Regions:
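Non-catalytic, beta-strand-enriched accessory regions in extracellular/secretory proteins
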Residues: 393-399, 505-513
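Mature catalytic domains of secreted/periplasmic carbohydrate-active enzymes
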Residues: 23-451, 462-482, 486, 522
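Short, surface-exposed tryptophan/glycine-enriched loops
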Residues: 447-457, 562
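Short beta-strand segments within Ig-like beta-sandwich modules, predominantly Fibronectin type-III
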Residues: 438-442, 552-557
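Asp-box/BNR beta-propeller loop motif
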Residues: 429-436, 543-551
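Bacterial Sec-dependent N-terminal signal peptides
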Residues: 1-26
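Predominantly extracellular/luminal regions of secreted and cell-surface proteins
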Residues: 298, 483-502
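Short coil-to-beta strand junction motifs in C2/discoidin
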Residues: 417-425, 530-539
Length: 562
């Protein structure tokens, strides 16, 4: 299977671009392998010529996409279902997919991506593979199809459409019988990719827990991706794919230095674990493409970042979170640190039990859209779209519109000619003369930097360091109204970290130092590890002396942590 995986998923080609009076350049599409004896300079040259596929470039240009977590969990109040839920509880009273798409379209989103099946195995379409679906629910007397309704709404409002299909299925009896379940999963995937028009993104996550029989599954990624390539060849394959990678967190934070031309080998390749371990990189690593990394690498991938985060604390709708929708300031910060950090933002907006995007979310999305529109409809730079071929140390001066006050600058590279900028500085000409207002490392498709507002007449952009010649496609400057964080009262009174200590790791044992009253606890794994050891199911015990333990009714599982 490993050899098949490498053969069927190794997508790399060389193209030559040029025109009348232009020097032709060779480009490597999606992947480049370095010769064994390549010097660092040769690797830098080849890295500069790595470019996205047309699908990857089109995906990057969407900038803002929406996740719709909706399903049986919406009605149980859980984040991860166990597959034992009764389909009878799925009964949205006012489901309106057009309201979803219309709301998101008005807010500037370019694609919606639906959880057609989450880990609980409940399917939002009337699949022929299982009875654990909408066909067994009272919604529309078992005749409903959420996927179809969303597809039709996307067609009506000219919105791109994507699907999330969980490989982990806690309901399927065949899960853990690897060949049988893989065939089962491919039938589900085939239904989604043949019955619902064009699919622009297929999203698989890496969760792989036990099924109802207590067994784990070995996924046939090779067969899954062949199915996608045959049925939806224009779709990008995200996360457990080689078109789009996970940024490494669910907080909405990209990297300040975000390389799309990365040394990280996608996990679907059999060699990925060995390659990434040798380089010391993983999805959360900060450095994925520096010269130091190139020196150690044997190959490079065009593998851009997708930043996924929920507008609420949870991924599925919970009524108690209606007052906890992220503030406008929080969303703005996320936007600048995702889209503004050379990534695509995938913002989750979960429909409620009625089957509507909740009023609290709609209001915030409208505020978010109005805020962005006010900023980005008034570019202060004159002639900022003039192409600029920049080498290390070169600079260009741009005139600003009269009486311009700015606090945001934006740079863009033409990524169809590679990602090349490694360091830049921006200065503004004020009444006091030239002053530095912004600096950064990578640019890529889009880089935005915020700074204290200044009044200026000109901008001077300097490319301090780049690979070969950087193709700057736009320089822009804007003014963003300052936002203040909302004051919220949380009913948490966490014990100071200095007041307790860990005395054992397995089972995890904490000495609180004194007798305290507890009402809740939180848990998070270490962030610095590539594959940290994590608790999934738990029981909770308390003791007055560390010897005699009493179980309290707090057993469960940490959903959405793996």
């Amino acid at each position: 299977m490993m050899n098949k995986l490498l053969t069927s998923l190794f997508l790399s080609s060389v193209i030559t671009l040029g025109g009348c009076g232009l020097t032709k350049e060779n480009y490597y599409v999606k992947h480049v392998e370095f010769p064994q004896d390549a010097t660092l300079e040769q690797k830098i040259d080849m890295a500069a010529r790595l470019v996205p596929t047309p699908q990857q470039a089109a995906w990057q240009q969407m900038e803002l996409t929406a996740f719709l977590h909706f399903g049986i969990n919406t009605f149980t109040g859980r984040e991860w279902g166990d597959g034992q839920e009764d389909p009878a509880i799925f009964n949205p009273t006012e489901l309106d997919a057009e309201q979803w798409v219309r709301t998101l379209k008005d807010a500037g989103f370019k694609m919606v991506l639906l959880t057609a099946k989450h880990h609980d195995g409940f399917c939002l379409w009337p699949t022929a593979t299982t009875k654990h679906s909408v066909a067994s629910s009272p919604w529309k007397n078992g005749q409903g199809d959420v996927v179809k309704e969303l597809r039709n709404a996307c067609d009506k409002y000219d919105m791109k459409f994507g699907v999330y299909l969980s490989p982990w299925d806690r309901n399927a009896e065949c899960y853990g019988d690897s060949p049988k379940y893989n065939e089962f999963f491919i039938r589900q995937l085939t239904e989604l990719l043949t019955n619902y028009g064009e699919v622009h993104e297929v999203w698989f996550d890496g969760a792989n827990g036990e099924g109802p029989n207590g067994k784990k599954q070995i996924y046939d990624w090779d067969a899954f991706y062949k199915t996608i390539q045959q049925l939806q060849p224009k779709a990008v394959m995200a996360i457990m794919g080689d078109d789009v990678r996970w940024v490494g967190n669910e907080k909405g934070l990209g990297r300040e230095t975000e390389w799309s031309a990365t040394v990280l080998t996608p996990g679907i390749y059999a060699r990925s674990e060995e390659n990434n371990k040798r380089l010391g990189v993983f999805s959360k690593a900060e450095d994925l493409g520096s010269r130091a990394m190139l020196e150690k690498a044997t190959e490079l991938f065009w593998y851009p970042s997708e930043v996924d985060v929920s507008i609420r604390p949870g991924w599925f709708y919970h009524a108690e979170e209606d007052s906890k929708v992220k503030s406008l300031k929080h969303l703005a910060d996320i936007y600048f640190q995702s889209v503004g950090y050379n990534s695509v933002l995938l913002l989750n907006i979960p429909p409620d039990r009625r089957g509507l995007i909740n009023e609290a979310d709609v209001q915030r999305l409208n505020e978010f859209a109005a805020y962005r529109e006010k900023i980005f409809t008034n570019n202060r730079v004159e002639k900022g779209r003039k192409d600029w071929e920049a080498v290390s140390g070169s600079e260009t001066v741009y005139s600003l519109k009269p009486e311009s006050e700015i606090n945001v600058v934006m740079l863009q590279e033409d990524i169809t000619k590679g990602q090349r900028v490694e360091s830049f500085t921006v200065e503004a000409l004020t009444e006091q003369g030239w002053q530095e207002v912004a600096k950064g490392t990578t640019v890529g498709y889009k880089r935005m930097v915020r700074f204290p507002a200044v009044k200026a007449t000109q901008l001077r952009v300097k490319i301090n360091e780049c690979r070969l010649t950087a193709h700057i496609s736009q320089v822009a400057a804007y003014y963003a109204d300052p936002l203040e964080e909302e004051n919220r009262t949380e009913n948490w009174n966490n014990l100071p970290r200095a007041s307790w200590k860990q005395v054992a790791a397995s089972p995890l044992t904490i000495d609180l130092g004194k007798e305290v009253e507890l009402s809740a606890f939180t848990y998070a794994p270490l962030k610095a590890e590539a594959k940290p050891t994590m608790a999934f199911r738990y029981k909770f015990y308390v003791s007055a002396d560390g010897k005699n333990w009493k179980e309290v009714p707090a057993n469960g599982e940490f959903s959405n942590i793996m």
